[in-house]
Amino acid sequence: MLAIIIELGWPIWPLIVASVLALALIIERSIALRREKILPATLLAEVIASWRKRQMAPGAIAELEQNSPLGRVLASALRNDHATREGAMQQVEAAGAVVANRLSKNLTLLGSIGSVAPLLGLLGTVVGMIAIFASQQAGSNPQELARGISVALYSTAFGIIVAVPAVLTYRHFRRLVDDYLVEMEDQAERLLEQVYDVPGGS
């Protein structure tokens, strides 16, 4: 394999860099988007219980905001700078937009690698084919020509190998983020029902 990489020359190096970067992004997002870090299972119940006990002082709300992405959204529903449920929902939507942006970190880059990798592989193959035919003289060995073409095609194959997991994981993470955001909105609405529909609510 090392010999093939050396034969492919400079066009293969962008693909190698892309593959390493894609792997790093996949690992980073897999860790960052773990459900327990985004949507702590008992957080909503704890917040509702604290609200009913009148324990959600500004300091507690600030601490909730730092708890997790869900905590940030729930905290926005408890801010005292809005007087109506509609105003609270606007705060929730604004917090949700910030959270969505943070959860989507690096996903665009991962998707771009998945899109560009096959093109880089094709570029390597084209460059290799040009070099092969330019070096051929009359009476050249057909076996050497066939081997040169075979080696050049490795570049396209490598590009596809890099692209497939990048595209699949990009789509998986995008779906995961979308699902998280829907669930955050649902939990925020359930909290607002408690805040605005019970005695003592705003």
Segments and roles (model prediction):
Residues 1-43:
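Hydrophobic membrane-targeting segments
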Residues 3, 134-147:
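Membrane-interfacial hairpin junctions
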Residues 118-127, 152-160:
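Mid-bilayer segments of alpha-helical transmembrane spans in multi-pass integral membrane proteins
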Residues 143, 147-170, 174:
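Pore-lining and gate-forming transmembrane alpha-helices of multi-pass membrane transport proteins
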